[in-house]
């Protein structure tokens, strides 16, 4: 599916218990913030001019951020199909992460 991310919007963080998710920026600019198994935060930038495929394995928390003043679009792919009421997603929180820096 295509996910639209509004200017300065933060989607997430959350994790998927069973599926690996792939993100590919098709319009605008995005930052994917991922917390690895050791609690280290990684910020991966991508845009439509230099797109990269970003893979987030299951059980890792991630958020999508649009740091710009324009709408961005992200192609989101998964290796396991979504099913209603499967409780496969879990909201999370990066305790010491500075989310406010993206609102400036």
Give short role names for the model-derived ranges.
Residues 59-60:
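Alpha-helix/helix-capping structural signal
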Residues 64-67:
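Asparagine-centered strand-capping/turn motif at beta-strand->loop junctions
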Residues 1-53, 69-104:
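Non-catalytic, conserved peripheral segments adjacent to functional cores
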């Amino acid at each position: 599916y295509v996910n639209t991310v509004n200017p300065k919007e933060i989607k997430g963080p959350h994790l998927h218990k069973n599926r690996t998710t792939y993100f590919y920026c098709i319009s605008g600019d995005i930052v994917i913030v991922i917390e690895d198994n050791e609690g280290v935060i990684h910020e991966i930038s991508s845009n439509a001019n230099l797109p990269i495929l970003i893979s987030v394995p299951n059980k890792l928390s991630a958020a999508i951020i649009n740091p710009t003043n324009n709408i961005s679009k992200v192609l989101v792919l998964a290796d396991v199909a979504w099913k209603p009421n499967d409780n496969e997603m879990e909201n999370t929180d990066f305790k010491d992460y500075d989310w406010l820096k993206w609102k400036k």
